[in-house]
Amino acid sequence: MRGCFSTARKRLAAALAALVMASGAGLCEAWVEIPITDIAPLRIGQTEDARAGTGCTVLIAENGMAAGLDVRGGGPASRESQLMNPLMAAQTVHAVVLSGGSAYGLGAANGVMRCLEERGYGYDTGFALVPLVVQADIYDLSVGDAAVRPGPDMGYEAAVRAFDAPNYRNGNYGVGCGATVGKIAGMETSMKTGIGSFAVQIGELQVGAIVVVNALGDVYDWKTGEQIAGLLTEDLKGLRSTSEYMKRSIASVDNKFTGNTTLAVIITNARFSKTQLCKIAGMGHDGMARAIRPVHTSADGDSVFALSVGQVEADMDLVGTLGAEVIAEAIIRAVESAQSAFGHPSAADLK
């Protein structure tokens, strides 16, 4: 038994040593950045209501993909999350939906199921095809029109786009349409963020992440430690620390610890089981912790999905390590690509 552990440690040490040797200032010089859409056969479609400030992003692998999930936030809004429990029978899912609308938006998955069924995809029960669609939502009802939430029609439209006209973009699109950060003092001093992605390739291995940043806390450049988004000063011209604000307002009864969640999806072309993907998803949360402070609060629904869409052989711990880094970088992209909206300035407005 001791010899087995020794062999495993040596394999992991060799993999991580290769990663460190190739790395510069955190990001690997050996990496080649690729578009997130290069990780085939995953399809991505988005739709949003720019007037109402909400939308959804759909990731589809119509023939099925192994999926894992790790939830660290205390207030998630999710659908069919138990499908990714290693104890459950299903080994693959057909789609992942990220949506606005909080719990109201969970109906978007019905539209994705309809699209998949129409195209002949799903688990064959002998009586009907049942597409397995999992979903997690952000709370964006405090932005735009709270009466408008993603539903079956919006989910269907995003799924159709994923098949017929893939349209993934970073910024105020899809689920990122109504995303904001720095909300502890109220929406008046919060900032606009969005959805972001970052993906890399090392040899045959591809690892990427899509993140919608809708956190209670602040966002930091994980490479420099500089705060780039979050709680605004009262004159709306600069940034202040959410953590410091929390310390000063510890006895306050009107803290607004509501309406938050950061959702991330790690995508890889490496072959893993859903048990392994749950571990990779858990490691991915390290990327959130590097870039968002505070994170994983009781008011956040912070969740990381991990998806395997290929057959490349790769070390699980290496992919988990890379997953954390691509999440941290995707968070920065979500901030940098966002545009001001609904009275909330973006990072570009502070430069």
Task: Please annotate each region the language model reported.
Residues 2-15:
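Bacterial N-terminal signal peptides that target proteins for export
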Residues 1, 20, 142-144:
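Charged, low-complexity surface segments at secondary-structure and domain boundaries
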Residues 30-351:
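Alpha/propeptide regions of enzymes that mature by internal proteolysis
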Residues 14-24:
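Bacterial N-terminal signal peptides
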Residues 2-4, 21, 301, 346:
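Intrinsically disordered, low-complexity segments
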Residues 5, 19, 34-35:
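A detector of low-complexity, intrinsically disordered, Ser/Thr/Gly/Pro/Ala-rich segments
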